[in-house]
Regions:
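Short glycine/serine/proline-enriched coil/turn segments at secondary-structure junctions
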Residues: 64-67, 93-96, 111-113, 182-183
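Transmembrane beta-strand segments of outer-membrane beta-barrel domains in Gram-negative
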Residues: 16-19, 29, 83, 134-271
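Transmembrane beta-strand segments that form the barrel wall of outer-membrane beta-barrel proteins
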Residues: 28, 60-61, 82-92, 102-103, ...
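Secondary-structure transition/capping motifs at alpha-helix termini
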Residues: 50-55, 76-82, 107-116, 155-156, ...
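Hydrophobic, well-ordered secondary-structure elements that form the walls
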Residues: 48, 105, 148
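Amphipathic hydrophobic-ligand
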Residues: 97-101, 249-251
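Periplasmic polypeptide-binding modules associated with outer-membrane biogenesis and secretion
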Residues: 1-92, 122, 127
Length: 271
């Protein structure tokens, strides 16, 4: 029988506990004055293991000199919250050479609840060959992506027992992409809010795309490209012409998958 969880001690560079007490409580399934349970021990390890802010967890028990009681100590070692990475790239698209650079910033514990903030900046340049009749032969692309992921459901009216039973994430994401090609200029702005979770058995997985918006804006199309490909009113170019118009696409989706070794089931609904 566990008498008390004596204390929770975090070991990091600053010797400070970086997680809120509520986060620790919600991810601890061992109970004070409750019976020792191997299932609850494994579940506690699993829950702390999925937190981005946690590097590793160690749970130990000490027998008390009186009765059949234990003290439980949970030690948490946290990751460094901030990381920055820089990555140069070389590109080769159908023989056209180019270069790209990528800068990524991550914060694994933004609000002291193991929230993951990711900001990704990317710039690319490519010299395009084989084009005739255009003012330039350069392709430029600049992309900014940002996402914030919570290791839990961010939604009202959910019972605490349901929140503790499942492994869930809530994610909001934004992206802006700027493309300048010799044939056209394109801007893409997108945003999404989604939930993902799986039940305790890990066989069932769910995803709800509560909101998924994509806006495509074409500020400029060269006269030659329009004349060669878009002004033809035949059915052959109808789909091609649609791809170079301003578009606003909104989507709601639900995905379900079941996987148990020998067989799997997948279902997807979008509207």
């Amino acid at each position: 029988k566990i008498n008390t969880i004596n204390y929770i001690n975090a070991e990091d560079n600053n010797s400070k506990l970086g997680l809120r007490s509520k986060v620790l409580k919600n991810n601890t399934f061992l109970k004070e004055d409750g019976y020792y349970s191997l299932k609850d021990l494994r579940k506690t390890y699993e829950r702390f293991g999925r937190l981005q802010a946690v590097k590793y967890t160690n749970i130990s028990f000490r027998e008390l000199p009186y009765g059949e009681q234990l003290d439980c100590d949970i030690y948490i070692n946290t990751n460094k919250p901030n990381t920055i990475s820089f990555q140069p790239e070389g590109t080769n698209t159908a023989g056209d050479l180019g270069a790209a650079v990528r800068l990524e910033y991550m914060n694994r514990n933004l609000f002291k609840g193991s929230e993951l903030l990711s900001i990704d900046l990317r710039g690319a340049y490519e010299a395009i060959t084989g084009l005739e009749g255009y003012n330039n032969d350069n392709f430029e692309e600049y992309t900014v992506q940002a996402s914030l992921m919570f290791p839990r459901f961010i939604a009202p009216f959910l019972a605490r027992s349901f929140r503790r039973r499942i492994n869930a994430t809530s994610e909001v994401a934004l992206m802006y992409d700027l493309q300048n090609r010799p044939e056209y200029h394109r801007r893409v702005l997108s945003g999404a809010w989604r939930y993902k979770w799986n039940d305790a058995n890990h066989h069932d997985r769910y995803q709800i795309d509560l909101l998924d918006i994509n806006y495509v804006f074409m500020p400029w199309i060269s006269d030659k490209f329009r004349e060669d490909y878009l002004d033809d009113n035949t059915n052959r170019n109808a789909i091609l012409r649609y791809n170079y118009e301003d578009l606003l696409i909104m989507k709601f989706g639900f995905r379900y998958s079941y996987n148990k070794g020998l067989y799997a089931i997948r279902a997807n609904i979008e509207t």
